[in-house]
Amino acid sequence: MGGDADPDALRALVHDLRTPLTIVEGFSDLLVRRGAELEPEQRDEFAQRIAEAARELRAIIDWADR
């Protein structure tokens, strides 16, 4: 996506990035602030959600960079 990128396509890309980024921010914040209070299963679930969102972000970025 160079300098002449379609503004609508750019808006769509930003929108697609926002959801997985929000997941990463939210669950990592929970782990930092309350990780010691959580059950191990909850910590594992949150870490899994973060990993899945990171993979989704990577896929979107790889798609946009082709």
Give the role of each language-model region.
Residues 6, 39-43:
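Residue-level recognition of alpha-helical structural elements
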Residues 52-57:
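Short alpha-helical segment of the dimerization/phosphotransfer core of two-component systems
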Residues 1-7, 66:
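Conserved signal-transmission helix
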Residues 11-16:
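Conserved phosphoacceptor histidine of two-component systems
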Residues 44-48:
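Short, charged, amphipathic alpha-helical segments
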Residues 23, 27-40:
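Conserved C-terminal segment of the DHp
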Residues 58-66:
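Short alpha-helical N-box/ATP-lid segment at the N-terminus of the HATPase_c
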